From Swiss-Prot:
Job description of the protein: Nucleotidyltransferase that catalyzes the formation of cyclic GMP-AMP (2',3'-cGAMP) from ATP and GTP and plays a key role in innate immunity. Catalysis involves both the formation of a 2',5' phosphodiester linkage at the GpA step and the formation of a 3',5' phosphodiester linkage at the ApG step, producing c[G(2',5')pA(3',5')p].
Positions of post-translational Phosphoserine modification: S13, S57, S188, S278, S410
Binding residues for Zn(2+): H365, C371, C372, C379
GO cellular component, one term: cytosol
Residue positions where 5-glutamyl polyglutamate is found in the record: E261
Intracellular or extracellular location(s): Nucleus; Chromosome; Cell membrane; Cytoplasm, Cytosol
Modified residues (Phosphotyrosine): Y190
Renumbered ranges of motif Nuclear export signal: 143-148
Stated name of the protein: Cyclic GMP-AMP synthase
Length: 495
């Protein structure tokens, strides 16, 4: 999705007091990548098994002495069944892996002998190889720590399901302008890469809008004005037109108003105060535990994807050209995330969203159709993404409200991860036994993105998520310094 959320829809996605609760009901009572975007890139090299691409990071003053449709997946046996697109199904809820200095190279040599690359296969450019990371890592222990509890998942899913379906019935009923909305579940929980606690959910209420015309805003590639090719009388969205332009701010305001009115009738749920520039209506559920649910209105278009996406989604060597073509035949979405204009926002603009495609990619992430199936080889792609998300999350906790970290979100981490998957497209580069090296490669790529100030949107390569217009250089330098310190000292922030 787009830089979405601090959390990006919250994320890039980024508490109003509820009114009198007449006849209140309890919740619980309810039953490729452009060259500039690839730091340190080389041209297509030979396929290889995973190996650390490590260069010793510069010393830090605080540095310590170094001492496609699939059958059931193996990961689902450990974490429970996948959440379906139309309903949250509570998923089911070892051995620590110890990394010794120099072990990555030994494993790399073994992998090169045991796993020959496919004839004629090539990989996209990657950063230079690096020495094995220092210190003892117990990454499997970290993954166990951030694994979601089955009991917590069941409780959270039941409550979120009930609230969301209640609101959906309200919007679909009567003569609402949003009568045609349908549910689209997105975000890390439904991608099965949520970490720590099931306390955040993203839900799209999609509304199909046929025969629309997009007008790109200031060559941004990501933000658009929306017009109707024809506007026959009786169009329920006509009231949201502003000089023939479908106003994102007007539509979001009405959507928010309907939700706020309905939430007054549900005990234990409130609507968070509106955040400037956010496309989401955020619900706060207080029981059984505090849960936030971002509800995002999304316009669904079944037209061809905009021209700005033509060179995006570089998965041909990873998931295959056929998969790419099939994904690009899916609809695209526009969310009411306004473009920045000076010190304010252009409130009539909509932003492209591909969160549904991101979910599909993560669900079917292997080059081989048997990757992570019960009888297939288990890869460590999702484990690396979880660890990257946890690293950023823990640094934010460590430094509290430091201004330098405020604009970084999990969407930046996920975008960098997708680019690493493009660089290393083969399953033999992501063997679970090589988790430490694969994670280090992801960290190395993210560090280079910070240092070069280049991170291309995975779907809209002309959009640089690390441009100085979006994130200032001192903030990128601060995060880079902290990640280098963690990397050189065995990631103490994990413990």
């Amino acid at each position: 999705m787009a830089a979405r959320r601090g959390k990006s829809t919250r994320t890039a996605s980024e508490v109003g007091a509820a009114g009198p609760r007449a006849s209140a009901r309890s919740v619980n009572g309810a039953p490729t990548v452009p060259e500039a975007a690839r730091p340190g890139a080389r041209r297509n090299g030979p396929s290889r098994a995973s190996g650390c691409r490590r260069e010793k990071s510069g010393p830090d003053p605080r540095e310590k002495p170094q001492v496609r449709t699939r059958t059931a997946r193996a990961e689902d046996q450990a974490e429970g069944p996948s959440a379906p697109s139309e309903r949250v199904e509570p998923p089911s809820a070892q051995g620590a892996s110890l990394l010794r200095a120099g072990s990555c190279r030994a494993r790399e040599a073994r992998s090169a002998r045991e796993l020959r690359p496919q004839a004629g296969a090539t990989e996209l450019a990657a950063p230079a190889r690096m020495e094995a990371p220092p210190g003892a890592w117990k990454l499997q222990t970290v993954l166990e720590k951030v694994r979601l509890s089955r009991h917590e998942i069941s409780e959270a899913a039941e409550v979120v399901n009930w609230v969301v379906e209640h609101l959906l019935r309200r919007l679909q009923g009567g003569e609402s302008e949003f009568k045609g909305v349908a549910l689209l579940r997105t975000g890390s929980y439904y991608e099965r890469v949520k970490i720590s606690a099931p306390n955040e959910f993203d839900v799209m209420f999609k509304l199909e809008v046929p025969r629309i015309q997009l007008e790109e805003y200031c060559n941004s590639g990501a933000h658009y004005f929306v017009k109707f090719k024809r506007n026959p009388g009786g169009n329920p969205l006509e009231q949201f037109l502003e000089k023939e332009i479908l106003s994102a701010s007007k539509m979001l305001s009405k959507f928010r108003k309907i939700i706020k009115e309905e939430i007054k009738n549900i005990e234990g749920v409130t609507v968070e105060r509106k955040r400037r520039g956010s496309p989401a209506v955020t619900l706060l559920i207080s029981k059984p535990k505090e849960i936030s649910v971002d509800i995002i209105l999304a316009l669904e278009s079944k037209s061809s994807w905009p021209a700005s996406t033509q060179k995006g989604l570089p998965i041909s060597q990873w998931l295959g050209a056929k998969v790419k073509n099939n994904l690009k035949r899916q609809p695209f979405y526009l969310v009411p995330k306004h473009a920045k204009e000076g010190s304010g926002f252009q409130e009539e603009t909509w932003r492209l969203s591909f969160s549904h495609i991101e979910k599909d990619i993560l669900k079917n992430h292997g080059q081989s159709k048997t990757c992570c199936e019960i009888d297939g080889v288990k890869c460590c792609r999702k484990e690396c993404l979880k660890l990257m998300k946890y690293l950023l999350e823990q640094l934010k906790k460590k430094f509290g409200n430091r201004r330098e970290l405020a604009k970084f979100c999990s969407y930046h981490v996920k975008t960098a991860f997708f680019h690493v998957c493009t660089q290393d497209p083969h399953d033999n580069q992501w063997h679970l036994k090589n988790l430490e090296c694969c994670f280090d490669n992801c960290v190395a790529y993210f560090l280079q993105c910070l240092k070069t100030e280049q991170l291309a949107n995975y779907f809209i390569p002309g959009v640089n998520l690390f441009s100085r217009d979006l994130i200032d250089k001192p903030s990128k330098e601060f995060l880079s310094k902290q990640i280098e310190y963690e990397r050189n000292n065995g990631f103490p922030v994990f413990w």
